[in-house]
Curated annotation (Swiss-Prot):
Keyword annotations of the record: Cell membrane, Heme biosynthesis, Membrane, Transferase, Transmembrane, Transmembrane helix
Stretches for region Unknown: 1-263
Pathway: Porphyrin-containing compound metabolism; heme O biosynthesis; heme O from protoheme: step 1/1
Protein name: Protoheme IX farnesyltransferase
Membrane topology, from the record: Multi-pass membrane protein
Region (Protoheme IX prenyltransferase): 264-535
Superkingdom: Bacteria
Provenance organism: Roseiflexus castenholzii (strain DSM 13941 / HLO8)
Gene name of the record: ctaB
Family the UniProt entry places it in: In the C-terminal section; belongs to the UbiA prenyltransferase family. Protoheme IX farnesyltransferase subfamily.
Disulfide topology: none
Amino acid sequence: MRRENARVVALPLFRTSWMVIALALVAYGAILAGSIIPTMTGAAVSSIATAVLGGALAMYTGMRTRAAPVRLGGRATAARRSYLTLAFAAVGMLYLAVVAGALNTSAGTLWTCQTWPGCEASGSGDWPALAHRGLAGVATILIAALAMQTWRIRHERALRVAVACALGLMLVQNIVGLVQVLLAQAGESLPLAVARLTHLGLSATAWGALVVLVTLALRRPFPSVVAAPSPATVARPGLTDTTLLEGKPSLLKDYVSLTKPGVISLLILTTITSMYITPAGIPEWSLVLWTTIGGWLMASGSHSINCYLDKDIDINMGRTSRRPIPSGRIPAWHALALGVVLGMIAFAILAIFVNMLTALLALAGFFYYVVIYTIWLKRTSKHNIVIGGGAGAFPPLVGWAAVTGSLAPEALLLWLIVFFWTPPHFWALALIREKDYARAGVPMLPVVAGDVETRRQIVLYTLSMLALTALPPLLGMLGWSYLLMASIFGGLFLYYALKLRRDGTTATAWALYKYSLLYLALLFVAMVVDRAVFA
C-alpha cells in the first residue's frame, strides 16, 4: 500500500518538465565530472550519464511534442524507415565515440597518438585512441548524411535546427580534438584540461541534439507522397512534399549554390597546378589535399558573403534574380553566417595543416573580394573588374606558398597572368548582360564607356596577358614546350578578342567568354605538363 502511494506521488512529479530538465543538467554535469576522474570509474560515470542525458532529452522532447501519426503509402514508409535508420545509426555511433573517448581519457591512452587525423604512436596502447578517432569520424559522416537527408525531405524547422546544431557541434568538437593533440605534445597543462572538457562537452551536446532529432522524427508526421502544401512549401513556390521526397529542388542545393562551386573549380585548378611547378618539386598528396580543402572553403565563404552583399543587385538582374536570396528561398543572413563560418574553418585548416603564410594569403584574397571588390569597387567604379580582378589571382599565390612557405617573383608572375586574364573574361559577359547591369546600377565598363570602348579594352588586356604568358621560359621558370602550348592557346584567345572587336555580336562575346574559361585551365595545365614531361 505504501509503495502504491509513493508511485502515485512520484510519477506526476517526474512527468513535470522541470524535473526532467534538472535530470538532464545533472547528467550533463556528471559527464564533465567523469572526464576529471583519472580512473575507469570516471569512464563509467561519463558513459552512464551520457545515456541518462539522452533519455532525459528524449523524455522532455516527447512531453513537449504531440504525436501526430499519419498513414503513409509504401514509398513514403520506405523513405521514413530509411531516414530513421540513418538517424539511429548516427546516434549510436556518436554514443560509442563518446564512450570510447571517456575510456581513453580514464586509461591515459588518449594522447598516445601524437598526430591527426592518423596516429603516430608515442607509446603502447595506441589502438584505443585510434578507435576513438575512427568512431568519431564515422559519426561525423553519418551526421552529415543525416543533415543532407533532413534538409532534403523534412521541412519542419525544429528538425532542421536540431540536425544543424548536431553537425555544427560535431565539426567544432573535431577541431577542438585536434587542438587537444597539439596541446598534449607539451604535456599536461591548464589549456589542455580546458580543451578536454570543451571537447567532451561539445560531444555530449551534439549527442543531445541528435536524440532530440530522433524523438521529433518519431513523433512528427513524415511527409507523404501526396500531401497538402505546408507553410514551408508555400514559402517556396513549386516545392511540395512530393518534390521533397524526390529531392528536387532542395535547400541543400540552394545553400551550395551560394558558394558558386562552378567558379571555385577554376580557382582551385590554378592553386593545385601552381603547387606542381615550384622549385620544391612534387608536393605530398596530403599537402595538396589540405590546401585544396582550405582554399575551396575560403573561396566558398567569400562567395557566400558576396551573395549576401549583392542581394539588392541580384534581384534586378535576370541572370541572378533566381538565386536563393533574391527569390526568397533562403534568408539573407544565412549567407552571411555561412560565409563567416566557412572562412574561419578555412583559415584554421590552412594555418594548422599547411602554413601560416598560406592561410594569410587566402584570407587576404577573401577580404580583397568581399571588401575591395564587392563592397567598394563594384558599385562605384568602371574599373571594378580591373582592380577587383586581383582577388581571383590569389589562388596561384596560395598554391605556391603552400609548397615553398614563401613567395617568389615567379609566383607574382602567375598572379599577374590571372589579373590580366580577368578583364577580357568578365567584360565579354558584361557585354552580354549590359542591360542587366544598367538596370541594377552597376557601373560595368560597357554601361559607362559603351560597347566599342569595351571591345577595344578587351583586345588591349588580351595582348598584355599574352605578353605575360611568354615570360616564364625567359625567366627560366618553365621550358619551351610550355611556350609552344601557351602560344597556341593564346593565339585562339586573341582570335576571339579580335573577332569580337570587329563584329561585336552576342554570339562572339559568348564564344570568347566560354573559351576564356577553358584557356586559363589549359594554360596552367600546360605549365604542369612542361614541368612533369619535358623538364
